[in-house]
Amino acid sequence: MGSHGTWPGTAGECSGYLVTSGSFHLWLDAGTGTFARLQEHVTPGEIDAVLITHGHADHFLDVIPAFYARHYGDLGQAGLPFYSPAGFMDLAALLVSENGRNVMAEAYAFDHLDAGRVVEVGPFRVTAFEMTHIGVYSLGYRIEVNGHTLAYTGDTGPCDEVIELAQGADLFLCEATYQDPMDHTFFHLSAEQAAEIAAQAEVRRLVLTHLTPALDPGVSLEQAAGVFDGPIDVATRDAVWEIGR
């Protein structure tokens, strides 16, 4: 639904993905603009759970309009399962409150995750991995269902944990914020670095995401293809992948 990093652009929203198995719908990250896109696929009441990687706005901010839709629009049940890194609820409470009441906690059933935790979310088995990022505690998730695996980095720089996260995944959804080697930091990846991780982890398919709107995705794709010889895509707002097919 959204795949841009840092800010949304005319061609796409910030990070946000709909992961579906059968009739179960998991909203994976909720970056700016993704709630509107989500409603092109499901109603707010059809969202069964939310899974957030970290507390940066381009990955979570649209849980706020989703909250208002549920709280004031009577769109969906109270207590929607909501999984996020430890401390996220405190941030959410700062953004939305009514006379000191943490009304977010009334709409969502928060479950705070730490690295190594494994939770069953509907049909999905979700394992949390600590990523290397800046400013906040950031997790990546390995999501398994019916013998197939989606690995999602959220935001990260190079680290051993991201290789472990991706190991043997059917689909590796990996951030690729940069193209210029001079832009490399310890807190994000380039397309080339994403491809190196994909090759080391022996994933089946690499999907580059979190490109800033200013980048030409064709360049990122070309850079990654020079390193990883498996199938590579760049995430777009309308892209759909059927994992295991």
Segments from the language model and where they lie:
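Active-site metal-binding motif and surrounding structural segment of the metallo-beta-lactamase
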Residues: 33-81
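Short Pro/Gly-enriched beta-strand edge/turn motifs at strand-loop
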Residues: 1-3, 98, 120-126
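Cap/insert and terminal regions of metallo-dependent hydrolase folds
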Residues: 157-245
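Active-site neighborhood of divalent metal-dependent phosphoester bond hydrolases
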Residues: 75-80, 88-110
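Conserved beta-strand hairpin/beta-sheet module of binuclear metal-dependent hydrolase folds
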Residues: 1-45, 138-154, 171
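Active-site neighborhood of phospho(di)ester-bond hydrolases with catalytic His/Asp-centered motifs
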Residues: 27-31, 48-55, 85, 151-154, ...
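Active-site-proximal loop/helix segment associated with metal-binding centers of metalloenzymes
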Residues: 8-12, 103-105, 112-177
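Hydrophobic packing residues within well-ordered alpha-helices of enzyme cores
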Residues: 38, 63-66, 92-95, 162, ...
